[in-house]
Amino acid sequence: LRLVGSEMCIRDRFIINDNVKLAKEIDADGVHVGQSDMEALDVRAQLGEDKIIGVSARTVEQALLAEKHGADYLGVGAVFQTGTKTDAREVEHSVLKEICTKVDIPVVAIGGITQDNVKELSGSGINGVAVISAIFAQKDIETATAKLKSCVEQMV
């Protein structure tokens, strides 16, 4: 299992969520931080220029500030109601689209995305999606992943 994990981390980028210290300790490829976590500017100072920094944003102002402070990509959401983060408020699709037009870094939509609703994000300008339940809550994870990937590839 350790060998498989090591090979996967060499082949694929490994981003730690919300834990800059851990990302630094294990030399992860990067870290994703939320608005209540450390500022992107401070994360960049700790991890260096070669690491990937993602920042959650719900508003155009947050997105622009994250980009200015060195974020490499944005996670914007929740774009739909989600059971994974019950306290998450939905980001209007018009705000998502505006964020996509205002920043020059990739925007990843997150929150409540399923194979059934992902096409509603078409034309928003997103570069990808992040999901949990759309894959892991399914009986056949491999098939669910392939179907969702196909839907996303058709739109972005």
What does each model-found stretch correspond to?
Residues 17, 37-40, 59-60, 90-93, ...:
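Structural motif corresponding to alpha-helix initiation and N-cap regions
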Residues 49-51, 105, 156:
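Short acidic, glycine/proline-enriched helix-loop-strand junctions
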